Amino acid sequence: TGYSKSGIVMNSNFTLDSGGYFQFGKITVVNMRVTNKNAVVSNGPVCSGLPKPLREADGKNVVVVVSSYDRVQGVLYQSGESQAGVLNLYYMYTETGNLPAGTTQRLLAVYLAE
């Protein structure tokens, strides 16, 4: 999965849908689709709140760079209750099992996927 070199550093809440992953050093780069539509998923709510820099990317694939607890093997969901720049993980597979709801990871950057 490629990504644009012009990174979009996030400082606000936003909504992410499911996506794939790949490992990049000690961080996990998650390829996800951005949406600003309200939705309900099986593992928890996905709330709207897309910041201005990514509104034009609605429905498109982006690459999300987060600090890594472990390699992401499932999907990330972000809560509307999340603090700025932090992902609230409702559901996440890792090599050592599922991380519990409410687990957070620091969001580093978001890129438009190539």
Residues of each region from the PLM?
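Extracellular receptor-binding modules and their adjoining Ser/Thr/Gly/Asp/Asn-rich linkers
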Residues: 1-42, 46
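Extracellular jelly-roll beta-sandwich "head" domains, especially the C-terminal globular C1q domain
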Residues: 15-18, 35-49, 55-114
